[in-house]
């Protein structure tokens, strides 16, 4: 947690582009929302050509959906949406009209990492001191 899922047409992103997008999303998340690098997950899923639609017409849309711990204010989430959109457009060359980016809130108590319920935003240090040694993380 967080989990970002990037859905794109098969063949539309090279390995290098996926790497840049994954690193960029990770950096945006850490810069704006905080947290621990090792817990930022980015997963790419691909659909076959002809199976993506935009406005009811076959196309090649890209969708980036993120689930983050609830508790960040809207200004942070808006900045994240904007930064991830710019990143995806710059790296992939996709038209803004074919890109959708969303961020959803998940209560920390509804998510686990390494078998441990996540802390609320701002409580990471105490959580890390408690479970960090169990997960092999420095406190």
PLM regions with names:
Residues 1-139:
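A domain-level signal for the structural core that forms small-molecule/cofactor-binding pockets
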């Amino acid at each position: 947690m967080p989990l970002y899922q990037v859905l794109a047409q098969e063949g539309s992103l090279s390995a290098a582009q996926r790497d840049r997008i994954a690193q960029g999303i990770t950096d945006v998340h850490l810069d704006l929302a905080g947290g621990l690098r090792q817990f930022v997950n980015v997963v790419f899923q691909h659909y076959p050509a002809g199976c993506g639609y935009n406005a009811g017409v076959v196309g090649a849309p890209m969708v980036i959906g993120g689930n983050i711990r609830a508790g960040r204010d809207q200004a942070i989430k808006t900045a994240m949406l904007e930064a991830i959109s710019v990143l995806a457009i710059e790296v992939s060359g996709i038209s803004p009209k074919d890109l959708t980016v969303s961020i959803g809130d998940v209560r920390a108590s509804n998510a686990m990492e390494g078998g441990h319920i996540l802390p609320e935003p701002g409580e990471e240090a105490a959580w890390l001191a408690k479970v960090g040694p169990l997960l092999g993380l420095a406190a």
